[in-house]
Amino acid sequence: VRNISSNRFDDGRDGTVRISDVARHAGVSPSTVSYVLSGKRSISESTRRRVRESIEALGYQPHAGARSLASRRSNVIALVIPLREDVHVPVAMRFAVSVVTAARAHDHDVLLLTQGEGPDGLRRVAGGAMVDGVIVMDVEADDARVPVLRALDLPSVLIGVPEDTEDLTCVDLDFAAAGAACVHHLADLGHTDIALVGQPPSVYERRTGFAERTVTGFELAAAERGVRATLRPCSPDTARGVAEELLRERPGLTGLIVHNEPSVGPLLDAFAEYGRTPPELSVAAIGPVPPGGPPLTSVDLPAEEVGARAVGLLMDKIDGPAHPGVTLLEPRLTSRESTASPA
């Protein structure tokens, strides 16, 4: 392969690197370069690598408009992201960043839609051929967007699981298994009186899928193990009241599962004022553990893996026939110093 020392070529035009320049540098035809960029035909790995190396060496940037006309694609996907008062934005942004990162690896950009646009937002981007597909977050059990997604001729993936999953492609953490894993962990340690401090009341009122599934797993596992269990919705500003209520109504409580990252700190502070601190009060968390606090037993929220899976599934649907189904990632519980056998 001959060296090209400059982005400027003597073809009588300006100095912009063109697809013909990449083809000449890589020793292939311009159509082969196009196929590598579009993925429309199978190209050998060695040729694909040579073309990619030439693209990088020359600094070639495909023209988005021309590429879209040629492939009938926008090379953009939409992400419907929840931005509302009861959503913990740092967690939502972890999913968003993972989707953007994975999309760029597939040569796609991401158009953000807010939850408030609802079904009309989906119709707008589909009707205007603005995107090649859409990923929807914060899915409710009876989500108004689901019938629209079924009706639109637009590939889609849900990060979350509604009640009716027919003809849908969904991916998420198995939150029911996560709730159950925490119960079994505490029961194995000998706890018989536990509580789940969950999401804000509004999350349950609108029947958000991940929250409902966590409660289901929690309650079924508690019944299976013969453990006394209760649910308390919570938000950071009600955490003290929730702690005081549990201490008053459940004096025998020895285990706590927290599915609400912003409330972890206020809850631990409130219990500590009454002399209840881990591991005397065993505490496990579902989701990210706030920095700076005690090391908590927890089930991690694999936002990066979920986002990457969602993008991969969407690209499969964009490139070929749909294969609907539900993918649930197995929860991984890490035991730390915050849980122990009751005294």
Predicted regions and their residues:
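Flexible loop/hinge segments that line or gate small-molecule binding clefts
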Residues: 137-177, 181, 199-202, 286-297
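Flexible loop/turn connectors
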Residues: 249-343
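An alpha-beta-alpha
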Residues: 182-229, 323-340
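Hydrophobic alpha-helical segments within soluble ligand-binding/sensing domains
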Residues: 171-197, 237-245, 301-319
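N-terminal helix-turn-helix DNA-binding module of bacterial transcription factors
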Residues: 1-75, 343
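Structural motif
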Residues: 108-128, 230-249
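Short beta-strand segments enriched in small/hydrophobic residues
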Residues: 32-35, 72-85, 193-201
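Amphipathic helical "hinge" segments at domain boundaries
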Residues: 45, 53, 60-123, 133, ...
